[in-house]
Amino acid sequence: MKAAIVFLCLGVSALAQQKQRFGQPPEQNRLASACGPQDQDYKVRLDRSQHGPVPPQAGKALVYFIHDDGTGVGGAGLGYPTTKYAVDGSWVGANHGESWFAVAVTPGEHHVCTELQSSLLAERVELAHLTVAAGKSYYFRTQLVTSRSVELLELEKIDSDEAGYLFSEYPMATATAKR
């Protein structure tokens, strides 16, 4: 019995040290090519008058981030966490509840990160990469899927038809960085 307790204590200690792999501090282990600084949070304002895509700027592509909170009520639930998004290591905006926003990017390959902004839920991160062409639009949907013991943040590419439907139902989000 004493041996089991010793092994349990050693195992917990080893797991606690895994955040500092390969001699790097934990912050440098964060997926720097996609996610932004961990301490950046946003306040989100919803604009219910904006419904729909906008044409891309000349020489740029647009990447849309649409969050579907799964409630089917077309708005932000009071307790629903904010979802923030990064492209190539810089946060570009956030959604709260069912909402969307777009960001202009240069043509080429990009790395996308989405993360829940919450102190109540454990860190939830999803990653993707995409290659974009000037004049084109690309769409990602996030959903927080919960069950009895599991919470998953899902990030998926969707087509323009699905995005068009979601634009018609959801307000546009404008995120302001918290100081």
Task: List PLM regions with ranges.
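Sec-dependent signal peptide recognition
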Residues: 1-7
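Hydrophobic h-region of N-terminal signal peptides that target proteins for export
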Residues: 7-16
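Short loop/turn and low-complexity linker motifs enriched in small/turn-promoting residues
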Residues: 17-179
